[in-house]
Amino acid sequence: MSLADQVLAVNDDLPIRTHQPVHSGKVRSVYWLTEQDSRRLIKEKGYPVAEDAPLAIMVISDRISAFDCIWHAEGGVHGVPGKGAALNAISNHWFKLFKQHGLAESHILDIPHPFVWIVQKARPIKIEAICRQYITGSMWRAYAKGEREFCGITLPEGLEKDSQLPELLMTPSTKGILRGIPGVPEADDVNISRQDIEANYAAFNFNQPQDIDHYETLLKQGFAVISEALKSVGQLFVDTKFEFGYVADQQGQQKLIYMDEVGTPDSSRIWDAQQYQQGKIVENSKEGFRQFLLNYFPDPDILLNKDRMPEREALARDNALPLEALMDISRTYLGIAEKITGQPIHLSHQPKQEIIAILDKEYGLIER
């Protein structure tokens, strides 16, 4: 079997019974179950949700997204071997740890397969909840240009690239394009301040103003739990993105939960602590792949300049990267996943067939 066959690149064509079109994201696809199947599974599996809660099957892929584009390698390899299973395993580990520490729950109800979550439908907060412990990336680029205000926060003079910040900073951005919010540009991933959120809490999908405090508490608590755990395996939790949403509990009461993935090399920067102490940055995250792309193409401005998006999309579509670039990120993801979870990641040889078989036999969700 070829490497291309072992990679799950297309994940929106599974014969899962749904009641609306499959939502296909950059990495995950979501299959919204019929009301009948949702009710049946809640009853059969004893999921701790309201009996009429809408459920979905969320299937991760091995696709690699960077600079808002999907990349591929020579030999017809359209993903990173082991990436999907590694990301899910890491998130599963952190969500379990959150529960042990008494933090909020996640949207995950069941894990039928390393690539699959059964989730409760949530109403998302329209914020990319970003937390930073070190100054790097977009914050450093702004700081190096002389900017001293970032997401409404005044940064002190004298900070150095990749140095630890005086305190943990929350630097939110918009999730998707939000329209009609005063002072917030109608574009994706726009930096916003806490004042923007407070003045327009309903537009960001908060039920009430005090939930802003709750979301910030959950963000800081989650960051602290992951940071401490990573420290114990010789890693630094540099920065990350969390997502939150509302679900109804068994009594029909709304509660704020963690959504999507947490603390993964896709959503975070993770550095090797020993190398950092020696003055070197060794990335155990997707940032290493981003840096590869910036060095690989002769005009890196295409990747950084949002006004050149058509050129960037053509670059990703028309250029097969060296296979070793994707294998390198595979080793990074599998390595950090094993460090975090304490277990090696099992690689599926036929992931799609495995998923269909399990969802058919154990969940009765496959259309004939």
UniProtKB/Swiss-Prot annotation:
Classification via InterPro entries: SAICAR_synt/ADE2_N, SAICAR_synthase_Vibrio-typ, SAICAR_synthetase_CS
One Gene Ontology term of the molecular function aspect: phosphoribosylaminoimidazolesuccinocarboxamide synthase activity
Official protein name in the record: Phosphoribosylaminoimidazole-succinocarboxamide synthase
Pathway(s) per entry: Purine metabolism; IMP biosynthesis via de novo pathway; 5-amino-1-(5-phospho-D-ribosyl)imidazole-4-carboxamide from 5-amino-1-(5-phospho-D-ribosyl)imidazole-4-carboxylate: step 1/2
Domain of life: Bacteria
Transmembrane segments: none
Catalytic reaction equation(s): 5-amino-1-(5-phospho-D-ribosyl)imidazole-4-carboxylate + L-aspartate + ATP = (2S)-2-[5-amino-1-(5-phospho-beta-D-ribosyl)imidazole-4-carboxamido]succinate + ADP + phosphate + 2 H(+)
Keywords: ATP-binding, Ligase, Nucleotide-binding, Purine biosynthesis
NCBIfam families: PRK13960.1, purC_vibrio
GO biological process: 'de novo' IMP biosynthetic process
